[in-house]
Swiss-Prot record:
GO terms for biological process: translation. The keyword Ribonucleoprotein applies. Belongs to the eukaryotic ribosomal protein eS8 family. This is Small ribosomal subunit protein eS8. The keyword Protein biosynthesis does not apply. GO terms for molecular function: structural constituent of ribosome. GO terms for cellular component: ribonucleoprotein complex; ribosome. Coiled coil: none annotated. Residues 1-30 are annotated as: Disordered.
Length: 125
């Protein structure tokens, strides 16, 4: 089943909206990329205009920025500690933007979008 991100067919009052045009390709969405903990695995996605995005399917390293000494290091991710998007993501070790992860340096919050950027960037808490 495809994901449609166009205009709804009903008004807030419940009345029916007449479509101006049929569904277009640029109104399509896609299934969410649930980035999990594991060996690095990427998927290339063709986006609008022939450009490409890289969906990160699995990853076990993150680029962690330390605001105190202003350095960035590539460190191993131990586990997912907190995820405000869905509490069940913690049990399944699914990472997205805003997730708190446990690393070798300590706890960090993910600032990148792994499902679209293809990399995990985080800031130490």
């Amino acid at each position: 089943m495809t994901i449609f991100q166009g205009r709804a067919t009903r008004k807030p009052s419940g009345g029916k909206l007449r479509p101006n045009h049929s569904k277009r390709r640029y109104e399509l969405g896609r299934e969410p990329t649930l980035t999990r903990l594991g060996d690095r695995e990427l998927r290339k996605i063709r986006s609008y205009g022939g450009n490409s995005k890289f969906a990160l399917l699995r990853c076990d390293y993150a680029n962690v920025y330390n605001p105190k000494d202003k350095t960035t290091r590539k460190v191993k991710i131990n586990t997912v500690k907190e995820n405000s998007a869905d509490p069940h993501y913690v049990q399944r070790n699914i990472m997205n933007r805003g997730t708190v992860i446990s690393t070798e340096l300590g706890d960090a919050r993910i600032t990148s979008r792994p499902g679209q950027d293809g990399v995990i960037n985080a800031v130490l808490l």
